[in-house]
């Protein structure tokens, strides 16, 4: 791959906790961030980045960082698969048995 060159570089920092930042390169890397002062003294930021993958598709991620932590969103972030219906039914059955007083030993064998 050839050397990438910066084709966009915008930065603004007001010195009071408000800022924005954006850049792009010739090989498709891009990033942007906007920041504002948070209610608890932290910097609240929103932004994202993207780049081209070897297969030609584009990776994209957006994020927010604030008093609630860092939260990222991207179709590339793995997600839990939903539980199959039979597992949900079995979990409900176990809860019902517990309500009726059922107990199990440490190996999962029902003792009452």
UniProtKB/Swiss-Prot annotation:
Q: Which domain of life is it from?
A: Eukaryota
Task: Please tell me in which tissues this protein is expressed.
Answer: Arthrodial membrane.
GO MF annotation terms: structural constituent of cuticle
Q: Please provide the record's keywords in A-Z order.
A: Cuticle, Glycoprotein
Q: Does the keyword Glycoprotein apply?
A: yes
Q: Which residues form the Chitin-binding type R&R domain?
A: 16-85
Asked if the Swiss-Prot or TrEMBL record annotates the protein with the keyword Cytoplasm, the reply is no
What Pfam families does the entry give?
A: Chitin_bind_4
Glycan-bearing residues: 79
Tell me what this protein is called: Cuticle protein AM1239
